[in-house]
A protein has these predicted regions:
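An edge-strand/N-cap motif at the start of beta-rich repeat modules
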Residues: 29-74
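Short, conserved, GDST-rich strand-edge loop motifs in beta-rich repeat architectures
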Residues: 36-48, 103-112, 234-235, 285-305, ...
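Hydrophobic core register within WD40 beta-propeller blades
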Residues: 51, 90, 173, 221, ...
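Short loop/turn segments immediately following beta-strands, especially the blade-tip
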Residues: 62-69, 115-128, 194-202, 244-253, ...
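Surface-exposed loop and turn segments in beta-propeller and other repeat-based domains
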Residues: 74-83, 126-166, 205-214, 255-270, ...
Length: 450
């Protein structure tokens, strides 16, 4: 069952044109001379690059998923960088010529959205030339989070400190197709931030977007490929709603269409991190919460544990298509489902051990055949020490490459970024602590929308 309230409220959000670019890539021939110089200037073509930051060291990572190269940059060394900041998320545009980085609020600094120009890159030398193009302050120093107070009321659902924000955190970057606009969400409040990625400005008169009852604790407004519908997640305890928006790319308006509940008032799933679109109408999302908290409504009989849901944005309904399992070899969601992706007819679920009574004991990547989207068929679960590196935990985010050949899966706890080959469902490349990674987060592959 679902809640789907149709409203006529119009919210202006800037929209123009975001053009699809050529799928050409710069790649290394295995037989090339060792002195071959990879092209330095990255523009006008879709590039095989992904970016991430490091929670612990504050580094910026650039991964080349074509030739498996890695470049590590200390952003403090870039002229114009605003200081020693706790970094959060990244975005790289399809051409690979511009990177956006967000930072958390501190007593000394506001939360920032920082635009970097990529002047040139040398994968052989492991260097990149970056220029600060803009530093956009999203608030004032010392701005606290606005998350609801929540307490544990049973042994099944603790309240971990990592999810209770201490100040403004800017998450959920998404690109609106066929426009010049990039969106971020402050999951710690109710604000959607809108950036013109051509001018590197917060859009005057439009930013921030605040819609009471909708934009609170959102982790990204995820648009379909045509840029006509956006889905907002509920990234906090007892938020069981997916917000549905209609965007007008020409006028910049966003119509609030309604909300889809993951279940009904008595039994529902809650706390969703990401949405993945299947086509122009259908999408999937996954939940993370195990049981009730102090925020749970008195009318709620049960919180449905971590599960996967098929969203019909035309009918405004949600159908549970993958249930929870208590067994590591079970045919369901074993840990909290943090992220998901659908490529080559298969559903991939990043499972993280962060919301139960243990923390980071393990982490898995579950794979299902999605030939029948209403009835996924379990294929296998990639496990630490077997399919994944020993000690691997907390599969947090998935960023597919634009050709769907690889999935880049990041773990901010165990320090790994994995390249999964979707043809064989095996790990094709491991970047980890031995390469200098500590707590990588905010993985974003060029050519993706989020």
């Amino acid at each position: 069952m679902s809640i789907f309230k149709k409203l006529n409220r119009m919210v202006p959000i800037a929209a123009a044109c975001f053009f699809s670019l050529s799928a050409s890539t710069l790649s290394a021939d295995n037989n090339q001379d060792s002195n071959y110089q990879y092209p330095n200037v990255y523009n006008k073509y879709l590039q095989p690059v992904a970016t991430a930051i490091d929670y612990y060291s504050g580094m910026l990572y650039l991964f080349n998923y074509d030739n498996d190269k890695l470049i590590i940059v200390n952003p403090v060394s870039i002229n114009g960088w605003p200081g020693n900041l706790p970094l959060q998320h990244t975005v790289i545009l399809p051409e690979g010529d511009k990177i956006y980085i967000t930072s958390d609020n501190t007593p000394e600094h506001p939360s920032y959205i920082i635009a970097l120009k990529v002047n040139n890159i040398d994968w052989n030398a492991g260097t990149v030339a970056l220029t600060v193009e803009a530093v956009m302050a999203a608030d004032s120093p010392g701005t606290p989070s606005e998350l609801p107070h929540v307490e544990a009321i049973n042994d099944n659902q603790p309240i971990p400190n990592w999810l209770v924000g201490r100040g403004t955190q800017i998450h959920g970057p998404t690109l609106l197709p066929y426009s010049d606009y990039l969106y971020f969400t402050e999951f710690t409040s109710d604000r959607v931030r809108v950036v013109n990625h051509k001018t590197n400005e917060l859009v005057s008169g439009l930013d921030p977007i605040v819609i009471p009852g909708y934009t609170e604790q959102t982790h990204g407004v995820n648009f379909n490929r045509s840029g006509t519908i956006g889905l907002g997640t509920g990234y906090f305890f007892d938020n069981s709603l997916i917000d549905v928006y209609k965007s007008n790319r020409e006028t910049g308006e966003l119509s609030v269409i309604g909300q889809i509940m993951l279940g009904d008032e008595k039994r529902h799933a809650a706390l969703t991190h990401f949405v993945y679109w299947l086509d122009e109408r259908y999408a999937v999302t996954a939940s993370m919460q195990f049981d009730k908290t102090s925020l749970t409504s008195s009318s709620t009989i049960k919180i449905i544990p971590p599960s996967v849901w098929l969203l019909d944005t035309e009918k405004g309904t949600a159908k549970r298509i993958v249930d929870n399992t208590n067994k590591v070899n079970g045919h369901g969601v074993f840990r909290s489902a943090s992220d998901l992706a659908v490529v080559n007819g298969k559903l991939y679920i990043a499972e993280e051990d962060t919301l139960d009574n243990t923390f980071a004991n393990d982490g898995y990547i579950s794979i299902f055949d999605l030939s029948d989207r209403n009835n996924p068929r379990f294929i296998k679960r990639l496990k630490p020490g077997k399919d994944l590196p020993a000690g691997y935990s907390v599969a947090h985010t998935i960023s597919p490459t634009p050709d769907n050949r690889y999935l880049l899966v990041a773990s901010w706890v165990s320090g790994y970024v994995l390249k999964i080959d979707t043809a064989t469902d095996t790990v094709a490349k491991v970047w980890g602590p031995a390469d200098g990674l500590v707590k990588p987060h905010g993985i974003f592959a060029a050519g993706g929308l989020r």
